[in-house]
Amino acid sequence: PVQNVFEATLNSPNLVIHLAASLLNLSKMESSPDFRHYRDGLTPGVFRLLEAMEEEKQAVMSGMGYTYVRSVDFLHSLDQPSLALFRELDGPTGLSHRYLTEDAYAGVNLMTSLAAPARGQTPIAQALVTLASALNQTDYAQEGLSLRTFGLEGRSASEINDYLETGELRI
């Protein structure tokens, strides 16, 4: 079990994988009608960026007092027959795909806003949100889910966790 909804959100593998890999594969996505994210898009260079995202996620989760679960390990075994479904999933097909829109808006943006109370740094995640914002002409940092969205901006990690567990903000 997880402590709260933020811990569950941060432990989603999508947060680490979707936005980063999609941005690095944008030209392939737009030019290849047969592009498959998990078959075609996970190159050694992409894995390096995913590992950097893992480090940022781990720092934020540790600072928030959450249990950290690595996201990218299963990707190294995608050639296993039991994971064939992942390799054949379509797309993403372009900028409006949920791997770019939802993950910039929700998971990755939330992680960047948790960096301050967690005393962590998220320059890679912030850069990904900035790139997705420019490409989709949407300011995900302002419009996306963040501590500000939930009225928790400026709160400490313990105050945030308290609120998520009790529904009460203590002054």
Predicted regions: what is each one?
Residues N25-E30, E55, A59, A106-S113, ...:
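Generic structural signal for well-ordered, non-membrane alpha-helices
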Residues V16-H18, G65, R119, Q137:
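Residue-level recognition of short, structured coil/turn motifs
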Residues P1-V2, G65-V72, T122-A125:
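Short, surface-exposed acidic
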Residues V46, A52-E88:
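Small-residue-rich helix-loop
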Residues D73-I171:
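Long, low-complexity C-terminal extensions of enzymes
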Residues N4, R36-H37, R70-S71, S156, ...:
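Short, solvent-exposed coil/turn linker segments
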